[in-house]
Amino acid sequence: WETQVRINDMLFKAFAPGMPTKIAASTKAMMAQAGFGIIDRENGEYHCNYEALAGGYGARATSDGPDAVQQHGQNTENAPVEEVESHFPMRVSRLSLIEDSEGPGKFRGGLGMRRDYHFPNDPATFTVLSDRDLVGPQGIFGGMAGRKAYYILNPDSSNEEQSELTSKCVVELKPGDTVSFQTPGGGGYGPPEERDPAAVLKDVVGGKINHQRARDLYGVVIDEETNEVDEPATNKARTELITSRNSN
């Protein structure tokens, strides 16, 4: 399975120069497998769970990549929070799209997702079998890479209790521990400074990217008080981005 989805991604990139309007940028291209085993101390029952999590899909020649979906060939779905929490003595303490995880482009990649597994009362064994923690999904035709994946133990704790996990590991958890599973964003298609400013504004207002990212990577300057595009400042910022890109 892991090999198949990565080969698909590699083939798409290889075919892209000859089929530019039919190929998407890179996706998460992995199963993103999260599993845990836990013994409920109240009744002695043993529980185990396995999930394959979604991530950002690559952008295409005419549209953005979908946010937090399963990629080509995976044929799985995310388990609903209510289902997981009703069957296992744990909590999904956070489930969200990851802001600024898209691969910037004329059409942006889809956002990755964050799912935090919290074990309030019982020790547990957690398994990460995943990838993309070194390099995020690549963009094409001037598009940029999506944010890479992160796997973090106790993400909201002090530095002493927080640690970054590798993409392939088994970790023993104590009561109160949390594992944050953060999948990558999809790659972008085309230069970011060619993106429609209205689309950038929509992403900012929708909480998918922040104002600074809009300015620095897309060259779109948005007034933070009115949430309107500053056209003169945007024209200047985009000219500077194009000049910088051409000089490199």
Residue ranges of model-derived segments:
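Glycine/proline-enriched, intrinsically flexible loops and inter-domain linkers
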Residues: 1-248
